[in-house]
């Protein structure tokens, strides 16, 4: 996984995808009511909100705060037939292969002024159009691979022989429009097909885009209920946002947006919900380093051991890793300072097998 987590935003034309993307990144990509206006994938980098950083900066007298970052890629309008090169099909597929997760914006609002490419509002149909295109693209990749592996298997290659039945199983599932992530593959099987970068194997999230009138209470929105049910059956995540509201928030200062959210009765913005859901989807956590220069968050996959976490900062620290000096953020905050935490015996030295936890405040000892 890349240093910055990368989420690809996809959706049919006119579902609010570019409006949401512009709000996310304030990048001002062209969000016209016009299919295919986003030809090159626009990339926007956003800070991952984490209130713990300000506490650490205050405690350590840090000159600056560096939050973790997340990259959102606006992937040009997908339409029916993209896997066969319709619309911007081939470009779409090459761009989406590079992302860590896919967020699919689904239109769950009625607005006669914004035409839907299929002429009516039906979120499940929209999801299935996109999923079918992704399944068809994967089917092509797996069938090509199968042809190659069959030749190798004939020469008696053991690995190729083991892989063939797996490929056949995946082909059968994709033919029934079943995403790879819903086919129950185990770790070993996923490793076997990793280099194929299959689109339907990527973690997926549905972003239900509702009207601004419903943002405080969308319990009566039948479209959202259907998407929630669909996501649950597929084991995918779901976030409900109003792209219009997000674009209004994007124009405001931090203080203004906090007041605006409070007026709407919301605890956090749709963007914050989207980032948190993406973190959960990819099993990510943050650890911290803090000192006079900076208080900084580093993103790692849950289950990462200390030396590999150190490698996020610099490969030399991973190579020369001796120990990690660690205190949990909660303990540190309760004690009020690093010294007080040390006196209470809450700062511990951990070796190379230590599995990092979310909120670990860390100082790595290493030798180059």
Each model region followed by its residue ranges:
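Conserved G1/Walker A P-loop phosphate-binding module
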Residues: 1-115, 143-144, 149
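C-terminal-of-GTPase-core extension/linker across diverse P-loop GTPases
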Residues: 1-10, 15, 21, 148-355, ...
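Glycine-rich, flexible loop/turn motifs
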Residues: 27-35, 42-44, 52-55, 84, ...
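Amphipathic alpha-helical transducer elements in NTP-driven molecular machines
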Residues: 36, 50-53, 66-72, 86-100, ...
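Short capping/connector residues at structural and topological boundaries
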Residues: 36, 41-44, 51-53, 58-65, ...
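Conserved Switch II/interswitch segment of TRAFAC-class P-loop GTPases
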Residues: 44-49, 76-86, 97-158, 173-186, ...
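Short, flexible surface segments
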Residues: 98, 357-358
